[in-house]
Amino acid sequence: MSLRRLAEHQPASFAFTPENQAWAEKEMTKYPAGRQASAVISLLWRGQEQDGWVTKPMIEQIAGLLSMPYIRVLEVATFYTMFNLHPVGEHLVQVCTTTPCWLRGSDAVVDACKKHIAPTPQTISADGKFSWMEVECLGACVNAPMLQIGKDFYEDLDGPLTEKLLEAFRRGETPKPGPQNNRRSSEPEGGATTLKEVV
């Protein structure tokens, strides 16, 4: 596993919005007395959804809410790669580069990200709209290569389709998730070859 550390530059403080604070307090009641620490992942996730990344002040705040030592919350945040430990752009592009996606051309997807976002991963684009990173399998191997933007999967990509996708996001559009090459779901690329009748 790679070494994961908090960003060098941190904000001065963190506070959940009133809505998220109420949500966090309710989330903690799902666990028996003395077991509120079980909510640590969901609270970190909610904090990341609020601010885009996990900060030291956020970890301190969550540790206080859950009556946990700071180091225990830090261990969770640095262990799970789903937590962003550095600032990210408005759109975080996560490119799958594991074997199925790589065999189907994820290198071209990475090259498009280098060209249209930043030459190195985990760097925010000059306009602040994007950052990108390579990730482990996202579970859409049948439609490889693919990437995730926000909570949506964009599949069956190549270099030009990835560039087109990023340009649409840059214009403020939200492209339709799923296959980008006109494939229907996970059917063969040329269309269904068996069981053609919909029952």
Residue ranges and their predicted role:
Residues M1-V199:
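Signature of N-terminal electron-transfer/Fe-S-associated modules in redox systems
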